[in-house]
Amino acid sequence: MVKFETVRGMKDYIGIDAEKIRYLESTFRDLAKKYGYSEIITPVVEEFKLFELKGGEELRQTMYVFKDKADREISLRPEITPSVARAYIQNLQSSPKPIRLFYFGTVYRYDEPQYGRYREFRQAGIEMIGDSSILADVEVLDLLYNFYDKLNLSKDITIKINNIGIFRKIMDKYNIEDNLQEHVLHLIDKNKVDEALVILEKNIKNKDIMDFLNMILTKKEAKLEDIESLAELEEVSKLDIKNEFEYLLRLSRILSSLNVKFKVDLGFVRGLAYYTGLIFEVLHPSVQFSIAGGGRYDKLIELYGGLPSPAIGFAIGVERTLLVIKDLKVEEPINVIVVGISEEAIPAMFTVSRMLRKEEYKVVINTKDQPLSKLLPYYASQGFKLAIIIGKQELEKNMITVRNLITRKQISIPLENVLDAIKQTL
């Protein structure tokens, strides 16, 4: 007999596990709306070229790509930012700026499955398009921090930040071509710094600059005074990157004033190839990987054929975030089981069920053909708090019996008074 299972790297979420995902989704959605963001829903399937154009070395190698019936090369989205950029050009380019958008959806990557890494997973994220100010950057980071604060994780997480513009400006100055730049950044992202330095040395051929690069790549936690000192170095002036360091100083001071827990890691880069300035990731001490990340991508929309538009955003790994939450208690409505003793009780069963559901109770109608002596203990073991019993005597008097399955307290009252009876038995 054929046996079907989930595809490798994918997972079913049932009951409370599904509820936790929906809880994170609703928490994020409510918060994003309070910041003035509007929801965008984009297709799971996009043209492969959308991601190939500026997807980054790693991303291009780990995608689901196939030909459709029209022989077009199609892919399952490995992330959502390019789809939002495409949708912005297609639908929103003439709208007043900045555009604030948020999303929640599944993405797909053909990675080797392991702890915290899946082939299908969920991302919640935002994009702000049309604003290049530091205020926009702070808003995005503040929203991200407040999301984790709502999950009671703000004391545990650290937001790691850097300015990838430092590396891009240095490589641009020495005319290092784009593809090689992405390869170098990919190596640094994968902690292959020595390999990256070998490539840079072949192209830069300047010992002072290489010493400077070696120094900043090992600055894993730069203090304000470190950044101030670096900004005054002769190499920084020669490379025309003083503004990039001063930006980090300004941002650090603002985040400190907002009590956001962060660190500046000058050796930190992100693997996605479209970042141009600020980059950041959310770290939690219980896992070795980031649980969220993002950055500024000021050239992506122009690359896709749109008008030049600065942009910044982030994506939260939903499943990864759930891994670091120790005790997520999703509020459940009170569970009520409605038991009818005969077929004649069916109209009354549905009448009372409708009344309770309007009041946000979770109501299940019993379909088991078993005696009450077995049904009530069974439903108590399944987490039901109340049972509404409609038997022959109740039908004759237009009454119902409400029983607390925990305390065993019960009362019989007219059907229309069911809400009062529930309050009395709880």
Curated annotation (Swiss-Prot):
Q: Which Gene3D superfamilies match?
A: Anticodon-binding domain (3.40.50.800), Bira Bifunctional Protein, Domain 2 (3.30.930.10)
PROSITE patterns, sorted: AA_TRNA_LIGASE_II (PS50862)
UniProt enzyme class? ligase
| InterPro entries per the UniProt record, alphabetical | aa-tRNA-synth_II, aa-tRNA-synth_II/BPL/LPL, Anticodon-bd, Anticodon-bd_dom_sf, His-tRNA-ligase, HisRS-like_core, HisRS/HisZ, HisZ
A single MF term (Gene Ontology):
histidine-tRNA ligase activity
Q: What is its main location?
A: cytoplasm
Say yes or no: keyword Cell membrane present.
no
Among the GO biological process terms of this entry, one is: L-histidine biosynthetic process
What top-level branch of life does the organism fall under?
Archaea
Listed under catalytic activity are: tRNA(His) + L-histidine + ATP = L-histidyl-tRNA(His) + AMP + diphosphate + H(+)
A single Gene Ontology CC annotation of this entry is:
cytoplasm
Cite the entry's keywords alphabetically. Aminoacyl-tRNA synthetase, ATP-binding, Cytoplasm, Ligase, Nucleotide-binding, Protein biosynthesis
- Pfam families of this UniProt entry? HGTP_anticodon, tRNA-synt_His
The cellular location(s) given in this protein's UniProt record come to: Cytoplasm
EC assignment:
6.1.1.21
Q: Which PANTHER family match?
A: HISTIDINE--TRNA LIGASE, MITOCHONDRIAL-RELATED, HISTIDYL-TRNA SYNTHETASE
Q: Which HAMAP family match?
A: His_tRNA_synth, HisZ
The similarity comment for this entry is:
Belongs to the class-II aminoacyl-tRNA synthetase family.
Annotated protein name in UniProt: Histidine--tRNA ligase
Q: Tell me the gene name.
A: hisS
